[in-house]
Every structure is written in C-alpha cells, then in structure tokens.
C-alpha cells in the first residue's frame, strides 16, 4: 500500500522527562506505525507550565505544528521566544539551540516532524528561565 493511516486511538503514549521541576511530558511515536523510513514523527502532550529539555540537534531539522494550545519555543543562543498558535508552525534548522514549552494553563498538543530519521545525537544545554520575543 502506498500510504499508511494512524488514527488517534492507535497512538501509544509514553512519559518523557521534562526540564527540572516540571511535570513529565508525553509522546506518541508515529514513525513506526506510519512506516516512515526517511523521517521521524511524533505527537506530544505538554501539561500546563511544562518545559522540554533545551537541546541542539546537529543533524535533524524539525517542524512543530500546534494542534491545541499555544506552543512556545525558545530558539538560538541567546534565546529568542516564539509563540505559535494552532494553524501556524515553526521550522527549526539543524544546529539551532531550542526548547519547547507550554506556558499556558491548558494542555498543549502538537505534532513534530523531523528529517533525516536520526535519533539520539542531540546535545542537552543549560535551561533558561525566559527569553525576549523574537523581533
């Protein structure tokens, strides 16, 4: 079959470590259920006021698409703050320091897609408290 469909009920949610002092996040891998070979895809759930771990991925570029809630992402060094509402997206190029956050009072649900399909070579860097909005 030249396509695969992954329904919401097919997702297997797993807890993932968050930044220090924040509640764990959840991810649902889509790469294998969708039989992707050249890229990686995941759904993410961030509880209110949760931060992912700040990191640099030297090889993978990623696209983040918020489906529910506002996705806040800190990019570059020094970091700049970008807020993305549902209907928008942010593309992060390889080698860019980044940290995804949910600074809202409701759960953030977003889709993340990256290529190439490499995993495990990100470098984690120091967390930051806040950053100015991007100009």
Regions from the language model: what does each represent?
Residues 1-39, 53, 122-135:
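A short, N-terminal "cap"/entry segment at the start of jelly-roll beta-barrel domains
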Residues 35-37, 47-51, 70-72, 79, ...:
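Short, charged/polar surface micro-motifs in flexible loops or helix N-caps
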Residues 41-45, 63, 81, 89-91, ...:
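Conserved hydrophobic/aromatic beta-strand scaffold that supports enzyme active sites
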Residues 50, 59-60, 78, 96-97, ...:
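A generic "binding-loop/recognition-motif" signal
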Residues 53-54, 73-74, 82, 92, ...:
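Short beta-strand His + acidic residue motifs that chelate non-heme Fe in jelly-roll/DSBH
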Residues 60-86:
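A short beta-strand-loop-beta hairpin characteristic of the jelly-roll/cupin
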């Amino acid at each position: 079959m030249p396509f695969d469909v992954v329904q919401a009920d097919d997702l297997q949610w797993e807890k993932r470590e968050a930044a220090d002092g924040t509640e764990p996040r959840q991810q649902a891998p889509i790469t294998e259920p969708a039989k992707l070979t050249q890229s990686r895809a995941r759904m993410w759930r961030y509880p209110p006021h949760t931060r992912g771990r700040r990191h640099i991925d030297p090889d993978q570029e990623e696209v983040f698409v918020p489906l529910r809630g506002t996705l806040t992402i800190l990019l570059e060094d020094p970091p700049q703050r970008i807020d993305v509402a549902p209907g928008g997206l942010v593309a992060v190029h390889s080698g860019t320091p980044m940290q995804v956050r949910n600074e809202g009072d409701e759960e953030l649900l977003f889709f993340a897609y990256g290529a190439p399909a490499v995993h495990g070579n990100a470098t984690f860097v120091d967390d930051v408290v806040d950053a100015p909005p991007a100009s």
